[in-house]
Amino acid sequence: MPLPFTLRQLEYFDAIAREGSLSAAAERCHVTATALALALDELERNLDLKLVVRRKGKGITLTAAGVTVLRQARQVLSGAEAFAAEAQQSATGLTGSFSIGCFPTLTPFFLPAAMERFAREHAELELEFLEAVTSELHEALLGGQIDVAILYGVDVSKQLEFEPIREYRPYVIVGEGHRLAGRGTIALADLGEDPLIQIDMRPSRQNTEYIFASLGLRPAIRHTTTNYELARSLVGRGLGYSLLVQRPAPSVTYDGQRVVNLELSDPLPPTVAGLARPRGAARTAKYAALREFLSAHTAV
């Protein structure tokens, strides 16, 4: 049974959705607006669906069916691109563009090695990266703006597949003058009413709240911040403690203060970081190579 569409028609439809007008999409695709309109008409006719609404002077908007078809079309196009890339692999390994998204608190621990060592090992790859919060990474993956995202295994969309690559044990940092700084290992309850400097980004905030709730504790939150290094600097100044997952190599904050890492004796589950991609998307050679590299070379 012949397919009711061509890849070219899907490419044109994707361009129309991105640009919001036939003329801009035609320029993007290097064809005439007439050719683009004919391709769209044929796609709608073959699918027996109304995909867009055309309003003179107001451009083009997608119908509800168009939104659904667009998401599926982008998955088909992504799979086709992956197929072409696999077929064209050079003897030296991987080629073409590869866009990686990453959650902000994970970025310093994953992306530098990827942008330097992984890129050097696969010199024909054109690496790009996007740093964004979880919801934006989900949208970028489903919209085809990035190929893969590095994020926590919390609140992952059901439209994505998540593959763990590293586990972390939560720990606490305190200033070097803190009364517990010399202990090495503590229970979270030992901090009592000490003020918490909380990382206020989803899912970091939710993970912190879950940890306290699972132990029957309620933190005394003093400050919240979306900036990982600001949290460390506030702790270094003796303004509270922070519950973290990643472990920077230096114990010195941006403003020259020292913080002390304290392990937690509480029976806490590990926090998982991994790779996400659209559900059903091809597991390309690029993806497999990145996964293998990050598993072996990621900073803790």
Can you say where each PLM-predicted feature lies in the sequence?
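A short LG(V/I)-centered, amphipathic sequence patch enriched
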Residues: 44-64
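Hydrophobic hinge/microswitch elements
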Residues: 133-138, 142-146, 151-152, 202-260
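Beta-alpha-beta core module
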Residues: 158-168, 183, 190, 229-279
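Secondary-structure junction motif
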Residues: 195-215, 250, 283-293, 300
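Short helix-boundary/capping micro-motifs
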Residues: 14-32
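A late-sequence structural motif
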Residues: 110, 259-300
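Interdomain hinge and pocket-entrance segments immediately C-terminal to HTH DNA-binding domains
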Residues: 58, 64, 88-107, 121-125, ...
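Central regulatory/effector-binding core of bacterial HTH transcription factors
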Residues: 95-158
